[in-house]
């Protein structure tokens, strides 16, 4: 009897256990179904997007190909009724540059090129309309053809073909401009000129990767450096040489509107492996050598400065230059004196070319500590340059412990430096940023870019040549995209919590500081693709999102693409604004799934031109 009782108890316990397991399975099944239905806390974000009309599918209806004509808007009638439609600006604004407006510039002093510096329109003068493309506008040629040919309709200015006719800058042929690769200092072409420089400067082994071209003209120097895997940041003012920077960008060469005047250059300290001036008309010896001191600030230890043209070899050329030899002699004396004060070593002088090299550290420059002319900059942050006045002072080298140590850290040759840990990271120069955090950021951007390519298969095919990252961070987006087919302008906002542009340059990438509450220093329609990572969250309560989006529209080419990554609530607001901007747009889930609150907004700008009342 006892045995039978024990057996019955065991069966009862087994039945209870089975019931408990079954009940738990049912509970979790019901819980999962409840969450998936849209009423669970975990999917409240997805529900919000559904209720707001957001579409998180993989943008099957967006067309990234170029057709020179846009498609009808994707915004439904009910949604369109709620959005503000931005009207086209008048046709006279096709090449409007808000912070380098010619009429406004003429109200400022001409001393030290102040009138050519950035002078942005006050709030009551801002244009709240869409900048039109000129009639006949077409998508630029693909690289490398774009290096040599630009459609006339895109930049219809023939002034340079007359002014620079004998210098072989640019020629007008039928419906295109042709760029023969010549220049004032390139009588045998830019390639031959660069060959001469390369006999002194190591351009072929990745040691020299980033370059600065001051007063770049149409940027032929930067264009022909491309095949040597050197990336030049070129700048020139918006002046009587109409559209020179616009031509550079139409050719697919990195360039911005800029000038050496009274304000520091918008680049970090120790950014460039070499700097270049070919008849750039900058008075290098003036203001106690202040302009050379600014070049020294942005030049890496061991970097090179090239001066081509007056006053080099003035004894032979003063008659051809139609300048008094006494003036040229004095100009060169001041340059040599400033270079000596900076402790640069003259490496080469032949014909009209001279090359100096900056020392790798200040071990050989101790004697200048006692020179009364050597005024050292007192600032603790040499990268704090936005709208800061230039000073006639020498930027100190970072400290070193031996005579052969490179101040600030030695960089690997490119392409190894692209993914190596930059010295600014490994040395702990950026507070709160560790090597692990940097490497994790790289992994994340490789993952993000892989997802972008699934959405837009044309991303790395050459369809998009000029790309901008509006909030670049460490340059992870650009590094993941790195290719001979494209380049990325890495913009670090001046209000960013951490200044990472120095890291961008240490990776062998290029970029610039900018405040997106103002217009960028470029012409309209100069970028094929714009990427904005958490930019609108960053500028929340700082300035109007409408103004930022209108600026994006100004600098984006017709049929260009936009990728905006941000929190979903921010993107819903952005999507509502761009519904009135002649963009086609879709919201896409994060690559890790719909429950991630970060989403991606993909957009394509429609094709339309001046005097058009609707898209073609």
From Swiss-Prot:
Lumenal topological segments: 35-616
Major place of residence: Golgi
UniProt-recorded Gene Ontology molecular function terms: methyltransferase activity
Annotated localization: Golgi apparatus membrane
Membrane topology: Single-pass type II membrane protein
Any one of the GO BP annotations: methylation
The entry's keywords: Glycoprotein, Golgi apparatus, Membrane, Methyltransferase, Signal-anchor, Transferase, Transmembrane, Transmembrane helix
Enzyme Commission number, as recorded: 2.1.1.-
One family name in Pfam for this protein: Methyltransf_29
Transmembrane segments: 14-34
Residues in coiled coil: none
Remarks, miscellaneous: Co-expressed with the galacturonosyltransferases GAUT1 and GAUT9.
Sequence similarity: Belongs to the methyltransferase superfamily.
Name of the protein in question: Probable methyltransferase PMT2
Source organism of this protein record: Arabidopsis thaliana (Mouse-ear cress)
């Amino acid at each position: 009897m006892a045995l039978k009782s024990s057996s019955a108890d065991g069966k009862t316990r087994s039945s209870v256990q089975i019931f408990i397991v079954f009940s738990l399975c049912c509970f979790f099944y019901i819980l999962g179904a409840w969450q998936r239905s849209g009423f669970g806390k975990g999917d409240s974000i997805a529900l919000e997007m559904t209720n707001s009309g957001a579409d998180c599918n993989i943008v099957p209806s967006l067309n990234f190909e170029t057709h020179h004509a846009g498609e009808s808007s994707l915004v439904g009638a009910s949604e369109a009724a709620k959005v503000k439609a931005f009207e086209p600006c008048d046709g006279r604004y096709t090449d409007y540059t808000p912070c380098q407006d010619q009429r406004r510039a003429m109200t400022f002093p001409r001393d030290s090129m102040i009138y050519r510096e950035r002078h942005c329109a006050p709030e009551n003068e801002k244009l709240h309309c869409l900048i039109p493309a000129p009639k006949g506008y077409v998508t630029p040629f693909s690289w490398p053809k774009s290096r040599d040919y630009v459609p006339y309709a895109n930049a219809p200015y023939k002034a340079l073909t007359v002014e620079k006719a004998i210098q072989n800058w640019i020629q007008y042929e039928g419906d295109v401009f042709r760029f023969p690769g010549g220049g004032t200092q390139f009588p045998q072409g830019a390639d031959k000129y660069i060959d001469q420089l390369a006999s002194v400067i190591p351009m072929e082994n990745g040691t020299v990767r980033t370059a600065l071209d001051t007063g770049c003209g149409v940027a032929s120097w930067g264009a022909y450096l491309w095949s040597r895997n050197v990336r030049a940041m070129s700048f020139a003012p918006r002046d009587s040489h109409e559209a020179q920077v616009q031509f550079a960008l139409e050719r697919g060469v990195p360039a911005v509107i800029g000038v050496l005047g009274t304000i520091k250059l918008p680049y970090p300290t120790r950014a460039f492996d070499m700097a270049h001036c070919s008849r750039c008309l900058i008075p290098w010896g003036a203001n106690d050598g202040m302009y050379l001191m600014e070049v020294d600030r942005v030049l890496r230890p061991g970097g090179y400065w090239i001066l081509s043209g007056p006053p080099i070899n003035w004894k032979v050329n003063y008659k051809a230059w139609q300048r008094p030899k006494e003036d040229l002699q004095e100009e060169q004396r001041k340059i040599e004196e400033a270079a000596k004060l900076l402790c640069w070593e003259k490496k080469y002088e032949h014909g009209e070319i001279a090359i100096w090299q900056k020392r790798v550290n200040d071990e050989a420059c101790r004697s200048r500590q006692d020179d009364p002319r050597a005024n050292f900059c007192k600032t603790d942050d040499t990268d704090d340059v936005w709208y800061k006045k230039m000073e006639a002072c020498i930027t100190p080298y970072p400290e070193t412990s031996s005579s052969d140590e490179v101040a600030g850290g030695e960089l690997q040759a490119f392409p190894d430096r692209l993914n190596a840990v930059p010295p600014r990271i490994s040395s702990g120069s950026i507070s709160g940023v560790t090597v692990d955090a940097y490497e994790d950021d790289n992994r994340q951007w490789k993952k993000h870019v892989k997802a972008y390519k699934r959405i837009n298969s044309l991303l790395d095919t050459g369809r998009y040549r000029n790309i901008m990252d509006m909030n670049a961070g460490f340059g992870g987006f650009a590094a993941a995209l790195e290719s001979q087919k494209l380049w990325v302008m890495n913009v670090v906002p001046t209000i960013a919590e951490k200044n990472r542009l120095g890291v961008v340059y240490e990776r062998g990438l290029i970029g610039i500081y900018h405040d997106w509450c103002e217009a960028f220093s470029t012409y309209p329609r100069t970028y094929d693709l714009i990427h904005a990572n958490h930019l609108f969250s960053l500028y929340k309560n700082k300035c109007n999102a409408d103004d930022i989006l209108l600026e994006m529209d100004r600098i984006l080419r017709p049929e260009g693409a936009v990728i905006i990554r941000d929190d979903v609530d921010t993107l819903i607001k952005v999507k509502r604004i761009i519904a009135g901007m002649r963009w086609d747009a879709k919201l896409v889930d994060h690559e890790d799934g719909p429950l991630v609150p970060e989403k991606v907004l993909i957009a394509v700008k429609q094709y339309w031109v001046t005097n058009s009342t609707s898209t073609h």
